[in-house]
Each structure stands twice: as structure tokens, then as C-alpha cells.
Design a protein with these regions (language model features):
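Short glycine-enriched nucleophile-adjacent loop
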Residues: 145-156, 162
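Conserved HGGG/HGGXW glycine-rich cap/lid loop of the alpha/beta-hydrolase fold
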Residues: 55-106
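Conserved loop-alpha-helix segment in the C-terminal half of the alpha/beta-hydrolase fold
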Residues: 256, 260-296
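Catalytic active-site module of serine/aspartate enzymes centered on a nucleophile-bearing elbow/loop
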Residues: 286-326
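Conserved alpha/beta-hydrolase catalytic His-Asp/Glu region
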Residues: 173-174, 195-254
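An N-terminal hydrophobic leader/cap segment in hydrolases
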Residues: 15-46
Length: 326
């Protein structure tokens, strides 16, 4: 099932966080009661796992939703989405993936190498869900989209649904035609290649093109991220994430829970973002996944939080029975 971009609106109801969230989702109409919820209501908690600890912010009460960011980022990437989900009636756990943000460094990878693999992140996700008393729906961005696939396939009793935002789930192939013809893809690949040398400057330059439009707090959020990445050891941890997504790709046929893939049509990481999302869905069992597109870049949860949160809440309300709010 494909949800066209035209069906996604920047709903004033989501922005308002008042008493009702009315959504129109194709043939479905959903109204969810909510309460005012601010970022200041979050509680920070550190979850001790084998090999390290994961920093989490916890918002709200209700069915559990776990948020996980992408590489070279931190949990503040979901600063606008997490309160919206909590306001819609969910208990939201927003985690820093291993080596990032306030989570500990120097974890031992299941690969035996100095990397942070998708399987590593998936195992951390499952550990966090157990700690908070799952099951849960996982919302994963980029590398964490691939990790969500693995978690769903390997721990189906704990993962009742997955949302993958611009995921690196499939084995990637460099597109020569895309590099020649698609300017945003060319810009993204050049900057990513330079950032892979461990250059914070080039990573920030990549982020500048990865956002198709800038949220109002873009400068402040980038300054906060840069400050985190300048901490001793953080860039080295970031560089450990440059591993193959083969482990996630191989698990796509084993996903049994409902899945939503959200692609930004202006994402510079893919020559054709919509085709990438379609390929992720097609590798899952029939009827499992659906695709939605938003006119935005790689960081939809920061760039287009209203549309992104709306899609997630619709998915939870209409596709995941365990997430129904009564």
C-alpha cells in the first residue's frame, strides 16, 4: 500500500496538541484524544545492557513506542516528534544509539570487529524494550531503520510494528546515472565520502544538504550536535557505523509485524528515494508493509515533524492492534 505525498498535511491539530487529533488516512478517519505535553515533561533514564548503557528520554503514558536516530546524531533529532506522540497517548522512549549522544562508548560488537552494526543496534533496542516492559513499536531512522527490521525479525514477541524513516536497510549500490543526473544525490555522496574520513566539518556540510528545508531551530540544533560530536571519542564511535546493511537486508523476509516506510523524496542519500522505499517493502512478506512519501530530505522527523508524526500516529491507530488507545 502506498500513501501518496498529497495525503500528508501539516495538520494544525498536530501543532496545537490540544484535546483532539483528527486525521484523515485514505478511507480511514481517526480522532485521538490527547493532552498538552512538553519536552520538559521528559525523564532521562540510563538503561544498563551487556557491554554498556543506553541513554533514554521517557515521555508520556500508554502503549510503548521506541525512537532511534541515525548515525552521527543523537536523540534530540526527535525533539519535535516525541512530544507529539506522547500527546497522542503513547509512552515514548527516545534512545541514543550505542556510542552516540549520552550513551556509553567502546561497546563490543557481535561481529567481533570495531564497528557498530545494525544487529548491534537491534540487540540494544530489544534490551531497552525489555527494560521498559514491552512490547513496542520501533521508529528507526537511517541505520536504525535497518536495525528495526532485525529487531522485528528476531524478537517478534517484543516488536509489534516498525516505522522506518529513510532507512538504510537494503544493500546499497552506488548509482552512476544518479550521480550524473541528480544534483542532490551528487552533493550528498561527495559530502558523505569526505565525512567518512572523520571530518566533522564535512559531516555538517552533508547535513546542510540532507535537510531539504531548515526547521526554525536548525542552527541551534546543529550547534548542539557539533558540541556532542566534539566530545573525546564521539567521532570515532560515529565512524564505527560505516558497516554493511547486509544483516538488515537478509532479515526483511522474516518481518511478520506491520511496517511503515517513510521516504523523503528529496533525500540526497538515494538517487531515487521512492524506489528505495518500494524495494524495502517488496522484500517483506506480502501485505506487511506500506510506503509513505513526504516532500523533504533525509531528516524528516526534524524537518517535517508534523507530517512525520501524523503518519506515525495514523499507522499506530489503524495498523497495529496492540497500539489501540481505548
Amino acid at each position: 500500500v502506498t500513501i501518496p505525498a498529497s495525503s500528508v498535511t501539516e495538520s494544525a491539530a498536530v501543532l496545537d496538541l490540544g484535546c483532539v487529533l483528527p486525521f484523515n488516512f485514505g478511507h480511514h478517519s481517526v480522532s485521538l484524544t490527547c493532552r498538552d505535553f512538553r519536552r520538559g515533561d521528559a525523564v532521562t533514564e540510563f538503561v544498563e545492557l551487556t557491554g554498556g548503557r543506553i541513554a533514554c528520554e521517557v515521555f508520556g503514558e500508554g502503549p510503548l513506542v521506541l525512537l532511534a536516530h541515525g548515525i552521527g546524531d543523537h536523540r534530540q533529532a526527535y525533539r519535535a516528534v516525541a512530544p507529539r506522540l506522547a500527546a497522542a497517548g503513547y509512552r515514548v522512549v527516545n534512545m541514543d544509539i550505542r556510542g552516540h549522544g549520552e550513551s556509553s562508548m567502546d561497546w563490543v560488537s557481535q561481529t567481533g570487529r570495531a564497528v557498530i552494526s545494525r544487529t548491534d543496534v537491534a540487540r540494544d533496542m530489544v534490551g531497552v524494550i525489555r527494560h521498559f516492559g514491552g512490547p513496542a513499536v520501533i521508529v528507526g531512522h537511517s541505520i536504525s531503520g535497518g536495525a528495526a527490521t532485525i529487531a522485528a525479525a528476531t524478537a517478534p514477541e517484543l516488536v509489534t510494528g516498525i516505522v522506518e524513516i529513510n532507512p538504510f536497510t537494503l544493500l546499497q549500490k552506488f548509482s552512476v546515472p544518479g550521480f550524473i543526473r541528480v544534483r542532490r544525490y551528487r552533493q550528498g555522496m561527495v559530502r558523505l565520502g569526505m565525512a567518512a574520513t572523520g571530518s566533522l566539518r564535512w559531516w555538517l556540510r552533508y547535513l546542510d544538504v540532507a535537510y531539504a528545508s531548515k526547521p526554525a531551530d536548525y542552527s541551534a540544533s546543529m550547534a548542539a550536535l557539533a558540541s556532542t560530536l566534539r566530545e573525546p571519542g564521539r567521532m570515532a564511535e560515529f565512524m564505527k557505523t560505516e558497516s554493511t546493511p547486509a544483516d538488515a537486508h537478509a532479515q526483511l523476509p522474516n518481518v511478520a509485524c506491520p511496517a511503515l516506510v517513510i521516504m523523503g523524496t528529496l533525500d540526497p542519500d538515494f538517487a531515487d528515494p521512492t524506489a528505495e522505499g518500494e524495494a524495502v517493502i517488496s522484500a517483506m512478506p506480502p501485505g506487511i508493509g506500506q510506503l509513505a512519501t513526504i516532500a523533504g530530505g533525509h531528516y524528516l522527523h526534524s524537518e517535517k515533524p508534523d507530517a512525520t508524526a501524523e503518519l506515525i500516529v495514523r499507522f499506530l491507530a489503524t495498523r497495529v492492534p496492540e497500539m489501540q488507545i481505548h
